[in-house]
Amino acid sequence: MNRLLINTPITANWDSDTNIDKKTIMDAVNALRSSHADIAYPYNGIVYQTSDILQIYYLNTKDIKVLYKNLNKLDFLYNQPIYGGDVFVNKNKYIDAGMENERNYGWGNEYYDRYNRFTNLGYNVYRVDAPLFHLCHSRKENSSFRPKTFHHIFSNELFRISNSSK
């Protein structure tokens, strides 16, 4: 285990291509600190895809209000709420749940795996009522979409996890 994790009660799993209002981060962390949650998402499952132009403007201003003011110009990254991107977890619960599933390959699969394992274990899940922003980027080797074979493998693993119990 990472030395930095030894002394912290909360761990975070954060996608580097996302951004969110710092107030939602504090809301999620406070839900964990007050024991109202075991796992806390600093957003409501809605993820907006930034456009190239809006992203450049946002990065120049570093003001999250730029993204909020332009929500009507953004597309949804997915057509349904998701459980990935950014998440905070009670460290001890995270360890008890097995941390990350090393059977997952690539990006995205671990989101649903983690959520299903934690809910199957009866963990309290908290979501902040705010969107997450995905910063647009090109898809290269490490972020490209995987062949169908990997989707089949992940589907089988997700089915296994979804049907597991304590």
Q: Whereabouts are the PLM-identified features?
A:
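Active-site acidic short loop of glycosyltransferases
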Residues: 6-9, 99
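Conserved catalytic core of nucleotide-sugar-dependent glycosyltransferases
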Residues: 21-102
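Glycine-rich, basic loop-to-helix element that forms the pyrophosphate-binding segment
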Residues: 1-4
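Short, high-confidence coil segments that cap the C-terminus of an alpha-helix
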Residues: 8, 36-38, 123
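C-terminal catalytic/acceptor-binding lobe
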Residues: 75, 81-82, 91, 102-166
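Short beta-strand-to-loop acidic/aromatic patch adjacent to the donor-nucleotide binding site
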Residues: 8-19
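Short, solvent-exposed loop/turn segments at secondary-structure junctions
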Residues: 18-19, 45-48, 94, 131-133, ...
